């Protein structure tokens, strides 16, 4: 997956640096900046970039104990096989020599074959004499390394990629690479005296500006943060230029998408009515089809009611024109601190981001950055840490796999995995689990003051005999209820709560809440094992891979509606 534009640790040599509850609990976490034998890195590591299927991860590290023979004293690039548990160093010359300079700012092609990275090393390719940080591509199958930050004529760049903005990205087939550079000699006629975003074609050898307008004119101000869809057709970038589209009148940094096949450029950091942002926008990432783009923005006018005065994360739908705020809690509460570094799943459903806000999930008391995942379908937001643990150090810069199941990030926390004693920033991957169980929506408050929450234990599965227990508590004692389920979410108002499932609905047999004898209190609970329904074959729609949305309904005769509802749960049926 294409990474967000990340502040990586480096390109520096070691000598230059000073020595929701159920959903969260279902997460498993692994520290990946370790050796093939599990030895933890003895220095800082960057956030990982992940392949689409979560098989491979790439990161850079100053650690010298991740592979044998690491004696160059510089940051190197490592690829971790998450399935086999092996780690290899890939920022080496084709003859196996260690690089003689620091390497970083890495990303993987979506299938893991190609690694693109930046390096100050001069011994990775022949003829590297510019003494600059260059961009390279490694083919992990052939072992070949190309330098791609060159002109169409093969001339070396006369300036660097900058460590804080240049995270090069490569298409799946390895043909196209986008990167940022301050060089003036990569394209003829480079006259803006500023940073530009570039596209290099590894088949034809051509290098051109990404930041051109439809008429072919170069951007008249700084452009950075280029990213690319896996097919190489669409690029997204950030620019201060005013000449990329007509009527760019806000005088601020915006996010743009360019169709590289047609040359058409679109300003996407706008409201649903097309209003340009009244604050800077930055760090865009596209879904593979180019439809959805997520980005960060300080603007207050992209959605109605943006009143928190903080940098937020937004998603713009290029098909419908709709822009939505996604750095919010499950109930829509806006963050009380900065959010950013957003990445998006391939279907546009899941957006991961980091935030210092304390209002996005309950009990966020660590006063530092965390990584969150927002589900645009269910509107639920959860904190990504693994096992529900709150990190005791900053956690940031997420990456995401195609379906949103696995989330990578870096963290300085020491309590995310056992045995974290290296006092370094490490790279982690959280697996949310195949079932992807998550709560969403809002429960009604009962006449007795109960707010029933739905939860689960076990896994929804067609095979075996293990249960998948669904439970709503607290509910009013001694009342009958039932579980409704369907295959899409919905949120029309239902008195004090929400009916969270779209029609058509199926209903289970009644269940009894039990609890104390009258009068009414909140001692009841509704429980149902869903797996016998799945395995019975009565509902032909309950097949492996199907996502189910469910919610408990129960009697509450003293309420205005005569009934109450829990919040809702979504899960995917497993084989």
Which residue stretches match the model-derived regions?
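A generic alpha-helix propensity feature with a strong bias for hydrophobic helices
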Residues: 6, 71, 97, 171, ...
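Residue-level hotspots within well-ordered secondary structure
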Residues: 434-575
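Bacterial N-terminal signal peptides
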Residues: 10-20
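Conserved "turn/edge" positions that cap or connect secondary-structure elements
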Residues: 24-434
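Bacterial N-terminal signal peptides that target proteins for export
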Residues: 2-11
């Amino acid at each position: 997956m294409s990474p967000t534009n990340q502040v990586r640790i480096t390109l520096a040599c070691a000598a230059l640096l000073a020595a929701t509850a159920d959903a969260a609990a279902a997460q498993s976490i692994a520290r990946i900046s370790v050796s093939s034998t599990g030895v933890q890195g003895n220095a800082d590591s960057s956030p990982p970039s992940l392949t689409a299927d979560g098989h491979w991860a790439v990161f850079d590290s100053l650690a010298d104990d991740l592979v044998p023979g690491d004696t160059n004293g510089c940051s190197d690039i490592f690829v971790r096989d998450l399935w086999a548990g092996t780690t290899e160093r890939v920022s080496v010359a084709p003859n196996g020599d260690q690089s003689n300079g620091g390497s970083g700012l890495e990303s993987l092609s979506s299938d893991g074959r190609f690694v693109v990275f930046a390096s100050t090393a001069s011994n990775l390719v022949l003829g590297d004499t510019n003494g600059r940080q260059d961009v390279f591509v490694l083919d992990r199958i052939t072992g070949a390394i190309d330098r791609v930050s060159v002109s169409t004529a093969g001339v070396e760049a006369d300036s660097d990629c900058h460590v804080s903005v240049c995270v090069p990205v490569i298409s799946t087939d390895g043909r196209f690479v986008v990167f940022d550079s301050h060089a003036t000699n990569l394209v003829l006629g480079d006259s803006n005296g500023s940073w530009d975003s570039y596209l290099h074609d590894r088949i034809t050898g051509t290098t051109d500006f990404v930041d051109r307008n439809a008429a072919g004119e170069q951007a008249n101000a700084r452009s950075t943060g280029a990213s690319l869809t896996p097919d190489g057709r669409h690029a997204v970038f950030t620019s201060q230029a005013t000449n990329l589209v007509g009527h760019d009148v806000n005088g601020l940094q915006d996010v743009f998408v360019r169709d590289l096949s047609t040359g058409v450029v679109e300003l996407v950091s706008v409201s649903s009515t097309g209003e340009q942002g009244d604050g800077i926008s930055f760090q865009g990432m596209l879904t593979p089809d180019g439809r959805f783009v997520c980005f960060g923005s300080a603007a207050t006018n992209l959605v109605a009611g943006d009143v928190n005065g903080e940098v937020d994360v937004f998603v713009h739908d290029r098909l419908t024109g709709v822009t939505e705020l996604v750095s919010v809690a499950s109930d829509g509460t806006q963050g009380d601190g900065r959010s950013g570094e957003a990445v998006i799943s391939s279907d546009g459903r899941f957006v991961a981001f980091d935030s210092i806000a304390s209002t996005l999930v309950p009990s966020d008391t660590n006063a530092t950055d965390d990584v969150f995942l927002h589900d645009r379908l269910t509107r639920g937001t959860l904190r990504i840490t693994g096992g529900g643990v709150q990190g005791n150090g900053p956690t940031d810069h997420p990456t995401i796999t195609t379906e949103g199941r696995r989330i990578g990030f870096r963290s300085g926390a020491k309590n995310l995995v056992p045995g974290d004693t290296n006092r370094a920033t490490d790279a982690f991957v959280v697996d949310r689990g195949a079932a992807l169980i998550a709560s969403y929506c809002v429960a009604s408050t009962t006449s007795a003051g109960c707010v029933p929450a739905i939860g689960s234990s076990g896994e929804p599965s067609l095979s075996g005999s293990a249960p998948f227990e669904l439970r709503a508590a607290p509910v009013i004692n001694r009342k009958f209820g039932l579980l409704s389920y369907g295959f899409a979410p919905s949120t029309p108002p239902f008195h004090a709560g929400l009916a969270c499932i779209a029609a058509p609905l199926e209903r289970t047999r009644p269940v009894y809440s039990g609890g104390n004898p009258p009068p009414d209190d909140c001692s009841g609970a509704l429980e149902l094992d869903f797996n016998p329904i799945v395995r019975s074959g009565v509902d032909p729609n309950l097949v492996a891979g199907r996502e189910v949305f469910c919610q408990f309904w129960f009697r509450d005769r003293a309420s205005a509606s005569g009934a109450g509802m829990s919040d809702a749960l979504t899960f995917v049926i497993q084989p």
